[in-house]
């Protein structure tokens, strides 16, 4: 039938595997402002709570990638330039500046990668540590985060 609305599909994905999902600010089932899909591998068991917790974390903190290996080099290079500009006028020796640069870059990577981020439900641990707490072997293959307006 015809509904008279101009509906255009902007994005689509194809994701297979053990998929978990979460919709934030849900106005009805499956409809909200932020949606997350998560694909994990595990050697055994039901990981519904784990999947939901990781999806909620992704919705809240918006990581750019799973790990620093997955970040585009251009993204890292832009941040390095920003850090260099911040440190340039500090007047400190070059060896100190290098260490400060490494520390700031490490913090940036932790804040922008899923495995490096502090777990939103328990900030005393990282997502990597949260995964390691599980008895079964779990690995995160992929995540997709959609937000209305982005």
Task: Mark where each language-model region is.
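N-terminal assembly/interaction segments in proteins that build large macromolecular machines
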Residues: 1-150
């Amino acid at each position: 039938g015809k509904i008279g609305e101009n509906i255009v599909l902007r994005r689509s994905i194809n994701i297979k595997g053990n998929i978990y999902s979460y919709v934030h600010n849900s106005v009805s089932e499956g409809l909200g402002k932020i949606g997350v899909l998560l694909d994990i591998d595990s050697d055994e068991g039901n990981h519904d709570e784990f999947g939901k917790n990781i999806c909620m974390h992704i919705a809240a903190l918006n990581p750019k990638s799973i790990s620093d290996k997955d970040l585009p080099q251009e993204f890292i290079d832009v941040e390095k330039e920003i850090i260099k500009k911040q440190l340039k006028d500090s007047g400190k020796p070059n060896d100190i500046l290098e260490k400060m640069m490494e520390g700031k870059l490490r913090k940036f990577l932790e804040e922008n990668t899923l495995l490096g981020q502090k777990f939103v439900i328990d900030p005393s641990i990282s997502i990597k540590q949260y995964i390691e707490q599980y008895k079964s072997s779990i690995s995160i293959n992929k995540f997709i985060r959609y937000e209305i307006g982005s």
